[in-house]
A protein has these predicted regions:
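Intrinsically disordered, low-complexity terminal regulatory regions
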Residues: 1-61, 185-217
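Short, solvent-exposed loop/turn segments that connect beta-strands within catalytic domains
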Residues: 52-57, 132-138
Length: 217
């Protein structure tokens, strides 16, 4: 009888690809009235934590040299990450990083740029994903969308336009990508559980060998 084909999955690579596709979708959405933003201007990272695993981790990014270290982002209560993690709606968008900084919800990194008045340039948007079952949060992740020069929406745009862009990003782009990202995070979680299981077996075998040697003596 023919055996079923083995499914080969690389969730880390898939998540990196999804980040690139997300950046392209955002670039297309943000073209408005002659205002454009390049895909390369948008930096996307995904920081996640699995149930029963101690540390937060960051997926492979397209520009890994940018941004704060994961520990800096997670452990500082004044980051947009922390604000989003604890927010009611699970999404925070500042078209102006300076506004986020002034409100104590952004920490500049070494890639941030400033205007002639010393004000931060660019935008920051964070979006929370939770995968749960039976009231247990098995996976928690924050998607961070950052620009370091141009804002996601023109600085001249009224608040109503900015709010509309936020709505469209959340409802028409992030909600769609959330499904794919959640699937890949679940596959990554299962992979990590499998690795942990193998490590525990090796430790158990090692302890048994030590115990047998001690008994022989």
């Amino acid at each position: 009888m023919t055996q079923p084909k083995r499914i080969i999955s690389n969730p880390c690579l898939q998540l990196k690809t999804l980040a690139s596709e997300l950046a392209e979708c955002l670039r297309s959405l943000l073209i408005h009235g002659g205002y454009t933003i390049n895909e390369d201007d948008i930096y996307i990272s995904i920081i996640y934590k699995f149930h029963d695993f101690k540390n937060w981790k960051q997926t492979d990014s397209l520009y890994s040299e940018k941004g704060l270290e994961t520990d800096e982002v997670v452990n500082n209560p004044k980051t947009t990450f922390s604000a989003t993690l604890n927010s009611k709606n699970g999404i925070i968008f500042y078209n102006s990083k300076q506004e986020a900084f002034d409100k104590g919800e952004y920490i500049p990194d070494n890639c941030d740029k400033y205007d002639s008045n010393g004000k931060l340039l660019g935008s920051i948007l964070c979006y929370r994903i939770i995968c749960k079952k039976n009231a247990i949060d098995y996976i928690t992740a924050i998607i961070s969308i950052t620009t370091y020069d141009k804002t996601l929406v023109s600085k001249k745009a009224p608040k109503s336009v900015i709010d509309n862009v936020k709505y469209n990003i959340e409802k028409h782009i992030l909600s769609a990508f959330e499904k794919r990202i959640s699937i890949e995070l679940c596959l990554l979680y299962l992979s990590e559980l499998n690795i942990r299981k193998k490590e525990m077996k090796l430790v158990s075998k090692s302890h048994k060998k030590i115990s047998l040697k001690e008994q022989e003596h």
